[in-house]
Amino acid sequence: MGGSGNWIKSLITNKKNITDDQEKNIKKKWKLWRTSSEGLISSSKGFKSRGGSYGTPSLGSDPPSFSADDSFTAAVAAVIRAPPKDFFLVKREWAATRIQAAFRAFLARQALRALKAVVRIQAIFRGRQVRKQADVTLRCMQALVRVQARVRAHCNRGPSDGQELEKPSDQQKDDPAKQAEKGWCDSPGSINEVRTKLQMRQEGAIKRERAMVYALTHQPRTCPSPAKASKQGSVKKNNGSCKSSPGWNWLDRWVADRPWEGRLMEGPTNSSENARKSESSVSEHDTVQVRKNNLTTRVLARPPPMSSSATSSESSSTSQSPVPFSGSFLEEGGYYRKPSYMSLTQSIKAKQRRSGSSSSCSKTPFEKKQSMSYNGDVNVRRSAGSDPLNNQWTDLYPPAQVTGRHMWAKSQRG
């Protein structure tokens, strides 16, 4: 029984030794903020534990454990001997770092809040802008849809004068020129604006007609043969078939491509049509107006058979002579006249009077009868194919008589 009791005692003593070693190891851990009282307590405990065995080492202690205890005691003694001022400085530094960390955290939180606020404001503002843009685009699209609906309804309704609706089909689509010729106008505006536009179109058509008449009067006048005259008349009648012919200029083609303005100008263009009719009648009779001694006369391009050679040479000489195209050379009837520097002087007029009087005295009865018949034919042609304005001028200024001697002299010169 004695052996069993010793075993129990040894087990209990070993447990106590193990717990003491663990406590020592825990206390040996380094603490930065160990107070002075704790250091003193630990040192006093160490000295007390050592005081009983001072000078008489225990039997169970080993040399390495003794050396470890000596190093620990030396470190504790150094800590105790250190002045208390160093600990205050360390505490201040530690407090400063803590304060700086807290202040920096506060600044970071404040900046984060400001950033969140800015982002929120930007999101709100951009959202408003996006909503405004979406609203504007939606309004524009609605306006376009309304305009398209109105245009379609207007096209389906057709003209407002009670006519039948025209069915839209590709085969029955009218030409835009014909639509404009009918008078259809879908331009927006009031009645006054439409009337002003129509008036402007009429004025433009009048100006174009005047320009056309001016261009026709400035063309060089020739003496064509009857076959050529009939061909030119047929070309003028057939507008659409021979626009590429040399008789058509750019103005004729341009005016012929605008039938609507021609119909609009049926009323106010009677004067221009009368002028053109008078010109066509003059061209049909193949007459040429010649100015001699400030007297306007018309000479037939086809003279009587007795004096055909003389008159043909005279007409060819007058038609082939170049005439400068300027507005100052036109008379009221639209024919050419010579400029002032080409008119005869007084001396030449006097010579012509003397030669005319001498020739009239020495004229034979046959020549007198021939000149009378020729002048009568000229007067008949003048009364048949001239306008009243030219008749007034011819009444004021009678035509000069052409004698057989003058005609024979001119034929000899030619």
Swiss-Prot record:
Residues 231-244 have a biased composition (Polar residues). InterPro entries: IQ_motif_EF-hand-BS (IPR000048). The keyword tRNA-binding does not apply. A motif (Nuclear localization signal 1) lies at residues 14-21. Residues 119-132 are annotated as: Calmodulin-binding. It is found in: Nucleus; Cytoplasm, Cytoskeleton; Nucleus envelope. CDD domains: IQCD. GO terms for cellular component: nuclear envelope; phragmoplast; preprophase band. Residues 164-184, 274-289 have a biased composition (Basic and acidic residues). Pfam families: IQ. One of its GO terms (biological process) is regulation of cytokinesis, site selection. SMART domains: IQ. Residues 40-61, 156-190, 218-244, 262-329, 347-398 are annotated as: Disordered. Residues 307-328 have a biased composition (Low complexity). It comes from the Eukaryota. Keywords: Calmodulin-binding, Cytoplasm, Cytoskeleton, Nucleus, Repeat. The keyword Cytoplasm applies. Its main location: nucleus. A motif (Nuclear localization signal 2) lies at residues 336-343. One of its GO terms (molecular function) is calmodulin binding. May be involved in cooperative interactions with calmodulins or calmodulin-like proteins. Recruits calmodulin proteins to microtubules, thus being a potential scaffold in cellular signaling and trafficking. May associate with nucleic acids and regulate gene expression at the transcriptional or post-transcriptional level. Belongs to the IQD family. Binds to multiple calmodulin (CaM) in the presence of Ca(2+) and CaM-like proteins. This is Protein IQ-DOMAIN 8. It comes from Arabidopsis thaliana (Mouse-ear cress).
